Amino acid sequence: MSEELDEEVLDGLTEVEKLYTVFHGASQEDVAYAKLFWNSLSLQPPIESRLVSSDIRQRLKVAKTPNTTNAAANQAPWSKRNEEIQQDAYLRQKQEEKQRYMEMAKNRDQIIALLKKQRDERIKKEMIAYKHKPKKGKLEEKRLAPKTLSSDVDEDQKEVQKLQ
């Protein structure tokens, strides 16, 4: 019986399969059984890696038909009133926000105008001082000059803070 199995297996194999499957030092019966085993064995991927599962629970449910035309027509009058109230509140909020931004822009313009005025006054004072500045000044005059200017700067800073 083993000889018949060997002959059937060897006859069924193609030339390529005969060349690539080599069993040296084994009996013909063992070679036939090994070839039959390796030819019948096919590795399947694990269940987790399959794209589609045969499990019924995994299938998607069928989408329901939308009935939006009836829902819009059957809308209650109180819901329309509610939408109007929400729209009014939204518009009021936008108006308040716009007004707040306008006030901030106005304050910004006032601060910029004050800073420009202070800059112009400072430049004017520097031009006057430049004309009368001695070429070689004493150290005491240099020390006293920043103190007198600092009082003007403090007043200007206080005015800017009041505007903010």
Curated annotation (Swiss-Prot):
GO terms for biological process: cilium assembly. Its main location: cytoplasm. One of its GO terms (cellular component) is cilium. It is found in: Cytoplasm; Cell projection, Cilium. Residues 132-164 are annotated as: Disordered. Pfam families: HOATZ-like. Keywords: Cell projection, Cytoplasm. InterPro entries: HOATZ-like (IPR040681). May be required for motile ciliogenesis and flagellar genesis. Belongs to the HOATZ family. This is Cilia- and flagella-associated protein HOATZ. It comes from Danio rerio (Zebrafish). The gene is hoatz.
